[in-house]
From Swiss-Prot:
Residues 14-21 are annotated as: G1. Its EC number is 3.6.5.3. The lineage of its organism: Archaea, Thermoproteota, Thermoprotei, Thermofilales, Thermofilaceae. Disulfide bonds: none annotated. It is an enzyme of class 3 (hydrolase). Residues 91-94 are annotated as: G3. Keywords: Cytoplasm, Elongation factor, GTP-binding, Hydrolase, Magnesium, Metal-binding, Nucleotide-binding, Protein biosynthesis. Mg(2+) binds at residue 21. Residues 5-227 form the tr-type G domain. This is Elongation factor 1-alpha. Belongs to the TRAFAC class translation factor GTPase superfamily. Classic translation factor GTPase family. EF-Tu/EF-1A subfamily. PANTHER family: TRANSLATION FACTOR. Residues 153-156 are annotated as: G4.
Amino acid sequence: MSEKKPHLNLVVIGHIDHGKSTLMGRLLYEIGAVDPRLIQQYEEEAKKMGRETWKYAWVLDKLKEEREKGITIDLGFYKFETKKYFFTLIDAPGHRDFVKNMITGASQADVALLVVSAKEGEFEAGISPAGQTREHVFLAKTMGVDQLVVAINKMDTVNYSKERYEEIKNQLIRLLRMVGYKVDEIPFIPTSAWEGVNVSKRTPEKTPWYDGPCLYEAFDFFKEPPRPIDKPLRIPIQDVYSIKGVGTVPVGRVETGVLKVGDKIIINPPKAVGEVKSIETHHTPLQEAIPGDNIGFNVKGVEKSQLRRGDVAGHTTNPPTVAEEFTGRIFVLYHPTAIAAGYTPVLHIHTATVPVTFEELLQKLDPRTGSVAEEKPQYIKQGDSAIVRFKPRKPVVVEKYSEFPPLGRFAIRDSGRTIAAGVVIDVKKAEGY
């Protein structure tokens, strides 16, 4: 793997059974990222079960299973490279904690592949109000995944019909435009994961009416997202250690800005001020750390007891914002009844977890257009998009999504389920900060 290529995290989204695993399994197999002997082995196992079409999907599913069983296997499967980029494939949805990981995890997606099935009835189910195609597209956009490639898959089930392709493409363009995607920048690729059409190479004999890129080529259409070096420093803390002979060492990932040895920093909410004595990443000393670096840094003048996971470090000249309250735009993914003002679930934002109250429902948005459907609604329910005023029940750092994307994305959870996901539009600073 070449180290010089920029690295992108790719998430694969779309309705269940539309062929996400099979398509990615096929791609990894065709470009040589998977040992062909494994595919052979899966083929034999799949045949025995009468499910031969599953052999490519098993590439990913077997790995998931083995990972869940705690067997360490080579995650090289989840990595592949194109001419321009080095990709890490993030667990596709269907994974229980997918939404939470998408927001709080290191698995922050940069770009997405949306897979939809061309099969009669399947496409319609995915794009229906209850379908995952719609939900995942909303979620991806809400979570700041601004670049997308679309695979219109299972084209073999409709005899590679140009009419069916156009019909689906036009419906998707409507959905994607409504959510806020720039549709003229999105490639729509007719694929068959099962027959290997337009996956790693163009297949004009099957789709003579299509003259665009194959899936593998389309991944190079992505633009590299800017790494926010010129923004003020923000480091959400993951852990804090006290090391004998060194002192207090917070650990976290630099999200924005640059941290240098000798810098004066403040860690909020506790208002702990200190000087950076040393920085290291994976046991290698650094003079400075930039966005994307996972680091431990020794701070003089701060005790371990003052800090905890969820605190955020910044420079004393631009301290992280502690929120009295904040306004967010959310999408309700799951709720058994309805949400009204006063509801107090749990807020997950960067590495922090605190109880939060829905203080006021300001507007309900039309999920089809994003325009205001209702001012000051009494309640919101599953499938709704809304603007809400939130009040954290404990001090927590919250930043505007427009200024600090990684600290302005959040999930709302209750009893182990993700209720909603959203972005911060505005923050009212807490007094005394």
